[in-house]
Amino acid sequence: MVRKSTRRTAKASEKPPETVVRCVCKSQEDIGDTWVQCDGCDCWQHASCVGLADKDIPESYYCEVCHSRSDVSSQVQNSPNKDEEHQTADLLASNEGNEKNNEENNVVSSDSKEAITKESGAELESSEPASTNSNVGMTTRSGRQSPRTPIGSTTPKSSHSPPSTRKRRGSVGTTATHTKRSKNAPKTSPKDASNETADQEKELSLHTSIDEIQNPVRKSVAKAWVSVFEKIIEKAKLEGVQGLEDLNSTSLALQLEHIMFMVLSYTTDHSLTPNNKYREKFRALRFNLVDDKNPAFRARVLKNEISFNDLVNLSSEEMANPDLKNLAEEIRQQSTENTVIKQHLIAPRDRLLDEDKLTQQDELGIAENDDAMFPKPPGELVAPISIAEEEPTIDSKSPTLPEHNPLSEDDTSNGDKAAKRKGSFNDTKPIVNVPSIVEIDDPTILDIVEEEPLARNDSFSSPYSPAEDMAEESEFFGMKEKIWTGKVKMATVSEFHANALNLFGDVSASHLFEILSATALIEGRISVSSVLQYFHALRKTPSKEIIAVLFVPTEQNSQGFDILYDYFVKRNRYGVLHSKSNSVKDAYIIPMPSGNSVPELLDLLPKVDLPKDRNFQYFMGLFVLNKSSSRHESVERATPITTSTNGIPSTYQSASGTPTNPVHSYPSLESIINALTPSDMLLIKDVVENNPQIRANPSLAINPQFMQNAISAAQKKASKQ
């Protein structure tokens, strides 16, 4: 066996450190093979090039250079030549076994070795005998040829060495605790990797202080939880909750934040950066915990009746006030019962109609077998699907009455009697636009859950008490018309109760309720410069109309008002209001400071009458309306409907089947209400309460075309059941 000398010359000792990747194949490319790192010089080598299989990589490994420099073992010091011979034999034997499975076994002669040794020169003298662990023509797993033919041997001298010698290869010297293997090219040192692992383990553990949290998002959430727990603990004590003396807001905040991150973010993404689910759950939990309407939920969390692990998995419905949930469930059950009652009322109602038909036939002198005059009961009517139907039903008729009775023009006595009887069958049975003339003031489930005051179209009643300590500005408020009372709300931020005073512009109480409903919802925020630029352009647009109102909080020093006011002032932003009316193009809410200063936006508006010395802060609402749309809607609200919903002139089907001329009379409200049976009222109520489109947009309840289609769909659904 031929081996190199282990003597290091002065020239070799002065050689600069090797590169990070230094394999015996002289290649630094990553070909997808397994890499192994030396415990001595931290250089990386292909495992296949040094004769190691993937399953045989030891815990500690030393390259050929570091192995020759190791002088820890006394056995190596006493007989270095023998040890080198054993080590070389081990490498050759291991490499030979690996080559039998993957490649052909090639042998190089000693003459080839001497030729290569002369070419390598001083560099070859400073290398280790273990570097000759490959035979001539040996290729790596990727199939590439080694650029230099390593020195091999036909028969190792130490072939009698036991297998334990191979396992001990690379274990001389220091011992390592981790196997250094990598499927990719090495880029970081083991020290950096261990530091990253330690930092990751520290970040995933439960922290004892907020300063230990490295991620800025998690640190911000933890600080917010500290503030929330301090607030809700004080609220719970005022609400009479006992056993909260030992609670530590910081400890609770760190525990909840850690569980939120581990359950909602890290378990799913395996990343130290919180995901969107983590952020959304934080907003939902914070809103429900600080909600004054939900003290029961807050007390259960503080008394640990709901653990943090269960808390982060609760839905919005599970966190809601239990009283409101029970009330909503009762409403749903009542709606179901109403549907069943409506189905059972159909048969008795038919019998009543038969008796009524006989009575009216006697009075009007109509033959008993003439069924053409009597329309079907409202419970069986079907609304028209399209205008082009060949046989229009009575639903397509206009809600108008004929000026004269076409059935008995000669019989004056019967005609007078029919004129006096406004509740007669022929005068009232044709279907009318019930939602347009009947007030629908039953609260929906959404209104009950949110506890919003019910808005009515004909009158205005304030469910809240006015502010008491505004004597300084009472004269100004007395001069302004209060046109709205409700709640100003921005989700996840704050809300407060307020009255709206008309500053300028033509707007009525009913119109403002139509725009805002009972809650003025702030959808988002917008920069001040954008609003200024927009209103500056509106000055040159005559087709737009601007209405301004002043939102005055109904409770002095309202905490919700202060939070929302500071939210916009600190960010130098205006709010964007949600409008439910098509006539409103844009709507904004502007913070009004106290004192004499006013926002720059007021210079672009008509002269606004405000108190000279304002002692309090307010919000001003600005609504940009389309003049044509607002005028058209006001006309529609004031003028009765005299045409059908599809724009077809009103007609009435006579007994002979010939339609009469269009008429423009409108039935009285009393006659319409008398014409509706209990089942009709239940049907209308069921549609208004349970139709998802009406719940999303309540203004659809006064849309005749939509209500006709909705009632028709409900009738068809009930008939199939």
Swiss-Prot record:
Main localization, broad class: nucleus
Ranges of Polar residues composition bias in the record: 128-152, 640-661
Entry-linked SMART domains: PHD, TFS2M
Biased composition (Basic and acidic residues): 111-121, 189-205
Family indicated by similarity: Belongs to the BYE1 family.
Keyword rRNA-binding assigned: no
Name assigned to this protein: Transcription factor bye1
Ranges of Low complexity composition bias in the record: 153-164
GO biological process: chromatin remodeling; DNA-templated transcription; negative regulation of transcription elongation by RNA polymerase II; regulation of transcription by RNA polymerase II
GO terms under cellular component: chromatin; nucleus; protein-containing complex
Residue stretches making up the TFIIS central domain: 217-347
Matching PANTHER family: TRANSCRIPTION FACTOR BYE1, TRANSCRIPTION FACTOR S-II ZINC FINGER DOMAIN-CONTAINING PROTEIN
Segments of this protein annotated with the region Disordered: 93-209, 391-426, 636-661
Highest taxon of source: Eukaryota
Protein's UniProt keywords contain Transcription regulation: yes
Biological function: Negative regulator of transcription elongation.
Pfam family of the protein (one): TFIIS_M
A GO MF term: zinc ion binding
Chain ranges of zinc fingers (PHD-type): 20-69
Localization, UniProt: Nucleus
Gene: bye1
Keywords for this protein: Metal-binding, Nucleus, Repressor, Transcription, Transcription regulation, Zinc, Zinc-finger
